[in-house]
From Swiss-Prot:
PANTHER family per UniProt: AB HYDROLASE SUPERFAMILY PROTEIN C4A8.06C, ALPHA_BETA HYDROLASE FOLD-3 DOMAIN-CONTAINING PROTEIN-RELATED
Location within or outside the cell: Cytoplasm
Subunit structure: Homodimer. Interacts with MalT and MelA.
Organism: Salmonella agona (strain SL483)
Disulfide-bonded cysteines: none
Any one GO CC term of the record: cytoplasm
Name of the molecule in the record: Acetyl esterase
Family matches, as InterPro entries: AB_hydrolase_3, AB_hydrolase_fold, Acetyl_esterase, GDXG_lipolytic_enzyme, Lipase_GDXG_put_SER_AS
Length: 323
């Protein structure tokens, strides 16, 4: 689709979203478009420092968890001494960017709003690590904490997964992996998904939206996919194209959040419609006037904070519901 035919989303954003788009961090250099992947990772970390400031204080603990691929760093956020459940968080970044620091504020707010321990998983990034390594690392982390719950004062009878963007795919894929492989490391009571991609190769929203402002042009999406997958056959894997998995049974309750002007919004819509058609518990909410990745900007956007609180409420409600 010619770029000129796309919807001019920058004129339709909410005032809060426009303020973020137009905000210039003092002293921040331009995005290193021609830099190597490590340079871009360092820039992303630097750029996110402002957005992670002024986050709630709480007890945190770092733990290196053994996995088949080597140790994976995790960070435990404990808002109170005891927790009714444990929520595992997978950060976004197109599978190639991001770490526990780039999403620190999001995890702190989730811990605060749920009152539960949140465990951030610093899974290995692509292209150095390819599918399904990040999923298998996540499953290994869950199994480890299931076996060492007392040591970390965790309640792993009830667990959940959460993630944004690529992390949302990893969150849902990990939960389905546990189900499909019959791995028990707690009762998955909910999955919180913010503007994820779930396997569509094309869609109306991918044609209408996406540009330099969000890093989600067709070329960008192709690049992320090629970095993550081992080969083209992986595109049809049921833990990458999640619509090729069985979504008709035993899917944990899903909170599905989308951004109005996100090229990936049709992934969320289709996931919701599929689960709803097969009586799988789910809730869908679209946040008007927003772009992909808006969850990061809660320092300037009340709707970002609202989206986190909505997910937290969904999770807390499932803590009280027998399943």
């Amino acid at each position: 689709m010619k770029p000129e035919n796309k919807i001019p989303v920058l004129t339709r954003l909410s005032d809060e979203m426009k303020a973020v788009v137009n905000f210039q961090q003092p002293g921040l250099p331009p995005w290193p478009a021609d830099g190597d992947i490590e340079t871009q990772r360092q820039y992303y970390l630097l750029e996110r420092r402002f957005w992670n400031a002024d986050a709630p204080s709480m007890t945190t603990r770092t733990c290196a968890v053994p996995t088949p691929y080597g140790d994976v760093t995790t960070r435990l956020y404990s808002p109170q001494p005891t927790s009714q459940a444990t929520l595992y968080y997978l950060h976004g970044g197109g599978f190639i960017l991001g770490n526990l620091d780039t999403h620190d504020r999001i995890m702190r707010l989730l811990a605060r709003y749920t009152g539960c321990t949140v465990i951030g998983i610093d899974y290995s990034l692509s292209p150095q690590a390819r599918y399904p390594q990040a999923i298998e690392e996540t499953v290994a982390v869950c199994s480890y904490f299931s076996q060492h719950a007392d040591e970390y004062s965790l309640n792993v009878e009830k667990i959940g997964f959460a993630g944004d963007s690529a992390g949302a795919m990893l969150a849902l894929a990990s939960a389905l992996w546990l189900r499909d492989k019959h791995i028990r490391c707690g009762n998955v009571i909910a999955i919180l998904l913010w503007y994820g991609l779930y396997g569509l190769q094309d869609s109306v929203s991918r044609r209408l939206f996406g540009g330099a402002w969000d890093g989600l042009t067709r070329e960008d999406l192709d690049m992320y996919e090629k970095a993550y997958l081992r080969n083209e056959d992986d595109r049809e894997s049921p833990w990458y194209c999640l619509f090729n998995n069985d979504l008709t049974r035993d899917v944990p309750p899903c909170f599905i959040a989308s951004a109005e002007f996100d090229p990936l919004i049709d992934d969320s819509r289709l996931l919701h419609q599929t689960l709803q058609a097969h009586q799988q518990p789910c809730e869908y909410k679209m946040y008007p006037g927003t772009l992909h990745a808006f969850l990061h900007y809660s320092r300037m956007m009340t709707i970002a904070d609202d989206a986190l609180q909505d997910g937290a409420r969904f999770f807390m409600a499932r803590m009280k519901t027998p399943r």
